């Protein structure tokens, strides 16, 4: 752009809307690419001059926008329809699997993402006062891969109840008797995707800290445990909980390292144990 703003040209928000420059899905993909490169180059101690160039380009990417009804926009133009229940949530890539938007670091954008996700689930616009239930998530939203993606999105946005509803939705509407997931034909995306989404409900590490139980529903809270989960930075995590509270955890790595840990609502710095 003449003012130096960088946009991906001639993009398309997958299977939805017109082709144009600066589609949010494309912008978010490039932001993630630049962020991943910058962190990898810094860790390896390489490409110092090129790191500066990439950081400058990242800073000039056209940013995410909040639209007229509070939604995270899908395009540069504010044309999102609050009653659109399209199956894709491509403009929420920055929430999951990306990491540009988070509750703690970008709360205004996270709130806008929640509004956009409610809209795609049929819980905004003319249905804004309709309770969010499994049954209200209808029509185009019932796909093998849609339930897991939205489960992971709700987990990243800290809503364990809605994340849990997405698991139940996949089992109720898009799982065959042999446990293959359907689109309605067989589609493996749902089987693979839901395991990743469940992991996001139990452990997150995308925002510079390890968070235990970020989004568990009430019916999981009584008692539970997980072992051997992996977190960014090469950490292995074990965890037990009772009544929604972590009562035990272990963090392992190749060598003892300090790490930020969010547990039971408290952020602390702990030292990992050496893997044996």
PLM region spans:
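A glycine-rich phosphate-binding loop feature that marks nucleotide/adenosyl-phosphate handling sites
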Residues: 11, 54-59, 214-220
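Non-catalytic C-terminal accessory modules of carbohydrate-active enzymes
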Residues: 161-275
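Primarily short, surface-exposed interaction patches in extracytoplasmic proteins
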Residues: 1-2, 8-10, 14, 115, ...
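Short, well-ordered loop/turn elements at secondary-structure boundaries
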Residues: 2-3, 91, 232-233
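Active-site core of glycosidic bond-cleaving carbohydrate-active enzymes
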Residues: 23-206, 247
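Short, glycine/acidic-rich hinge or "gate" loops at secondary-structure transitions
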Residues: 1-8, 46-50, 212
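C-terminal, helix-dominated tail/subdomain
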Residues: 7-38, 189, 213, 230, ...
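Generic structural signal for residues positioned in beta-strands
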Residues: 7, 60, 74, 94-96, ...
